[in-house]
Amino acid sequence: MRGSRLMAWCLGVLAVLLASGAAVLSVAVDDAQARVSAQTRDDVAQAAAETSAALLTYTPDTVAADQYAAGERLTGDFRARYGQFTDTVVVPTSRTNRVTSTATVTATGVSSVDGDDAEALVFLTQVTSTDAAPDPVTTKVGARVDLTRIDGRWLVSDFEPS
């Protein structure tokens, strides 16, 4: 009888230890996932903010290079549409009318992250001037920004100003 009590006690202690270990492991995994999620959200917010500002910032003398550099942060159909728009509208207009545009991000929020796809909202202040209208015009811009992670980099796959 004594041996069976000892065996029952040992099994009970073992069960408690296993349950405790499982609980600790579960908390550790959840904590690691939360850190990865927070880091991913930070990466998405940074990519959305930096790219949004780059899309809306240029000077007449550097517009082609500025827009090319911004295009390197894009992907998919949006990259092709953006390239065509800048080549046919932004670059010639900036050079002809001496348009300078500077965009500063005022706020960024990540709406969702699902694997390698994310959506963010970016709010910017854009200051634009031309030779014909040298007094700067300030505009508040909000945009929904879709991003896709490719080879570890978050690239903008769509940019919809509102």
Predicted regions and their residues:
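Solvent-exposed, non-transmembrane alpha-helical starts
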Residues: 131-137
